[in-house]
Amino acid sequence: MCGSFLRRVAAEESRHPTPVGRLLLPALLGLRLVLLAAGGTGVFGGGEEQSEFVCHTQQAGCKAVCYDAFHPLSPLRFWAFQVTLVAVPSALYMGFILYHVIWHWEASEKVKTEEETLSQGEKGGEASRAGSSRLLWAYVAQLGVRLALEGAALGGQYHLYGFRMPSSFVCRLEPCLGSTNCYLSRPSEKSIFLKTMFGVTGLCLLFTLLELVLLGLGRWWRIWRHKSPSSNYSPTSQSAKRCKAPTDNFPVVEIRERPGEAGERGSEVPLSARP
């Protein structure tokens, strides 16, 4: 029972997504997690990065204020928050699939006999089609939310960090005395990683948009095929009609003899048998 339930969940989950949504989007999400776990902690480590942020001043509190102005939000925490937000719509969609499968599972358990199944077959088919339509629109909605989140993340990353990390930063905030020059460690490495994460986010945005376009084209194609007159043509039905057509050119004539005529014909004696 558990195996069939899991197969049903997997079938419902893979019914509407195209290969882009089924393979590429999860792969890019996994790539983000690997990049953050393998490289992000080493490149943008919180304690080490702040300790390597050097300012030409001995004024108390100046270095902390300048570092806060340079990095209002740590890039590593920003990307972790972004991945969490992007994964929320997919998690909600999976929860909706589980609810849909459990609801249909309980409804099918209520059907006890074959007669009830046959009598309710049409209603069950309508309910299944309605459920499939709800799953499709739920999938489209979660793709739309993901598209908005990816676009907001790209804009936020560009606003906070730009495309490259500068090697120096001029700070003019209190309690610093005048302008203070501060220097960042490994700016080239940080710039490369920043552009990599920007590119991965851009690919996720592009593939999410492509998935929506493919879903729209697929739905339009199904509607066009359903309305097309040629789709109603069936060679089997046409051949069946030809086989069942009456043969008017060769009518069948049925001749019946009357009982009286049959008796008279049987009572006649041939001429050769007469004396």
Swiss-Prot record:
Q: How does it sit in the membrane?
A: Multi-pass membrane protein
Which top-level group of life is the source organism from? Eukaryota
| Residues covered by region (Disordered) | 254-275
Gene3D superfamilies given in the database record: Gap junction channel protein cysteine-rich domain
Question: Which UniProt key words apply to this protein?
Answer: Cell junction, Cell membrane, Gap junction, Membrane, Transmembrane, Transmembrane helix
Please name the GO terms that the record assigns under molecular function.
gap junction channel activity
Q: Which residues lie on this side of the membrane: Extracellular?
A: 44-77, 156-196
One GO BP annotation is:
cell-cell signaling
The UniProt entry, under InterPro entries, shows: Connexin, Connexin_CCC, Connexin_CS, Connexin_N, Connexin_N_sf
Entry-linked SMART domains: CNX (SM00037), Connexin_CCC (SM01089)
List where Basic and acidic residues composition bias occurs: 254-267
| Localization in the cell | Cell membrane; Cell junction, Gap junction
Q: Which residues cross the membrane?
A: 23-43, 78-98, 135-155, 197-217
The subunit structure is: A connexon is composed of a hexamer of connexins.
Biological role stated in the UniProt entry: One gap junction consists of a cluster of closely packed pairs of transmembrane channels, the connexons, through which materials of low MW diffuse from one cell to a neighboring cell.
**Protein name per its UniProtKB record:** Gap junction gamma-3 protein
Species the sequence originates in:
Bos taurus (Bovine)
